[in-house]
Amino acid sequence: MSDGTLFIQDSRTSKQYTISVTSDTITAVDFQKITSPTGKLALYDPGLQNTIIKKTQITGRDPVTGITLFRGLSAKEIWNRHADFEDHFHLLVFGKYPSPEESEALRRRLAVQMTVVPETVIKAVQAFPRTSHPLPMIIAGLAAFISADPSSLPAIRGGNIYHGNRALCDEGVIRATAAYAVVMGLINSHRKQLPYVPADPQKSFYENVFAMMRCPVHHNYLVTFREGMVLNSDNGMTQSSVVLLSTASSLPDPISCLISAITAAYGPLHYGAQEAGSTTLKSIGSLDKVPEFLEQVKRRERRLFGFGHRLHKREDPRLASVKRWLKMMDYTPDQEPLLELAQEIDRLASSDEYFIKRNLRANADFYTHFLFKAWGFDWDMLCAANMFHRIIGLMAHWREAMDQPIKIFRATDLYVGPVVIQEDNRTVLEEPKIQSRL
């Protein structure tokens, strides 16, 4: 039973309150009914650990098995349909698995949009030194895409243009997705001093991506990349999804929202963990140094990225698939010595009491960066390459938000600083105060 009533008695005032419970949730503003002489009751939730910010039909979990469901379909069901990017994009973003005709129409729209390469975008990317990290180049390239079409900016148009306008939202998600692929292709060619490979209007999205990024176009590589897309396309309210939705709540264009999500994802506690993890592996150096590294982790002197997971408290259900894909591509320590180091860390940690007691196991991210390396991406491109999968979920959340009532994200904070400064320089601290909106 998930609906009911919460009965509350406030010991401060002896007042009693009733708050409705629906689907195991309560509405946060209902707590404002609970008052005292010092003010209304507020919820303190750093990091939004127990706060629901939106209703969604995109990604959920089977309550019995815990299997992730994408619009009600499991990854296995989607794999069995041999879904390509266009199929899964249509499912998550537009809400239904496409017919062959709908999939082809979307493929064509994406491919044609990918042939649009504004000169300002080329100049923005090429203005960077070839040794630059991809992140600032991506941000600059996407920003240049926005500048090439000022009509996409709501503020310039005089206000909201996307919220409630499904047709314009559909154009927006396609343009943002194509823009990301173009920018990545330009960055790759610029850094490697190679000619830019333009998109082919006759190819699928991932066929164009592999050509533009000069990835090995082998059958198993594309098969595993597409299967990886399904698992990696969305994982609910990740930090980058929350940031995207926070940005979207002020109703800007989708590329601006995408920029905010990408910037957030590059932090070492999110997708940046994969790049940070590969850097950590390189610093270990050799197999014989793995035991000492793990001891340093246990002493909190070093950080082990890719172990433990906020959602998956036991074995990460994605991990078996990641290992299967590495095997399908015959990717072994012979191709990448760091893989042997990772396997040794996994082996030793799995039998170490410290990690066992804390339920710290290798998650999919611990091995995923080897997948992207096998697919042909450079180590410092790992987070950026991940976005070729996750952009589906990000665009799905943006479009869904544009269909729902909008509340601009505006939290409050609890001020705990000085309140009164005495003339004799003594600081008097009163009780912490909830900030009124400035």
Curated annotation (Swiss-Prot):
Q: How is it used?
A: Phomoidrides A and B (also known as CP-225,917 and CP-263,114) are potent inhibitors of Ras farnesyltransferase and squalene synthase. CP-225,917 and CP-263,114 inhibit Ras farnesyl transferase from rat brain with IC(50) values of 6 uM and 20 uoM, respectively. CP-225,917 inhibits squalene synthase with an IC(50) value of 43 uM and CP-263,114 with an IC(50) of 160 uM.
Q: What pathway does this protein act in?
A: Secondary metabolite biosynthesis
Q: Catalytic residues?
A: 309, 365
Name a biological process GO annotation: carbohydrate metabolic process
**Catalytic activity from the UniProt record:** (2E,10E)-dode-2,10-dicenoyl-CoA + oxaloacetate + H2O = (4E,11E)-2-hydroxytrideca-4,11-dien-1,2,3-tricarboxylate + CoA + H(+)
Q: What does this protein do?
A: Alkylcitrate synthase; part of the gene cluster that mediates the biosynthesis of the antihypercholesterolemic agents phomoidrides which are dimeric anhydrides. Within the pathway, the alkylcitrate synthase (ACS) tstJ and the alkylcitrate dehydratase (ACDH) tstI produce the decarboxylated monomeric anhydrides by coupling the C12-fatty acyl product from phiA with oxalacetic acid. The pathway begins with the highly reducing polyketide synthase tstA that catalyzes the formation of a C12-fatty acyl-ACP, starting from one acetate and 5 malonate units.
Q: Give the UniProt family note.
A: Belongs to the citrate synthase family.
| Listed name of the protein | Alkylcitrate synthase tstJ
Q: Which organism is it from?
A: Talaromyces stipitatus (strain ATCC 10500 / CBS 375.48 / QM 6759 / NRRL 1006) (Penicillium stipitatum)
Gene label: tstJ
